[in-house]
Every structure is written in structure tokens, then in C-alpha cells.
Amino acid sequence: MTIGLLATIKVQPGKGPEFEAAFADLAKVVKAEEPGNLQYDLFRAKEADTYVVYEQYADQAALEIHGKSDAGKAGMAKMGSFLAGRPTLQFLDKV
């Protein structure tokens, strides 16, 4: 079953461009190295310093691979330095 994930992310004021660049680097790795990833896109919200990542995975196993990959962990660590708090995650099941 396809799994969707919405991650709402608040970044520190003025750090948006750096966060966007770090996300772009991570997205390239995810799309190249995770065949079970179907979508991994960043959206800038209307609210200042707020982003939403829309992710889709072929199944639970693909989602777990994403959470455990070394490249993913490194990318998340890099982006983490720009965050203003923990992301809010909403998991979705495709109907």
C-alpha cells in the first residue's frame, strides 16, 4: 500500500535559502538511491519560515529504508542545523 507523509518544518528566521539548498541536495540522493520513494518534494508555506515536505513511498519497507539510509541521516543532520523545532509528521494511507 502506498504511504504518504507530510512533514511540516519550521526553520530559523533567515535560514530558508540554506535549508532549501540542503533539501535539494538530500532530494537528489533520495530520488537516486531509494527506488521505493515515489515522491519527495519541498513546498514553501504561506506562513513565514515554514515548509512542507510531501513524500510518497511504495510501501512500509520503502519508508523504513528512507529512515535508515546513511545518506538520508547525513542530509537530515545538515538540515537540522536550520530548524526552529521538531518537524510535525502526518502519515497517510492512499485510498
Predicted regions mapped to residue ranges:
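Short hydrophobic/aromatic patches at helix-to-coil boundaries
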Residues: F91-V95
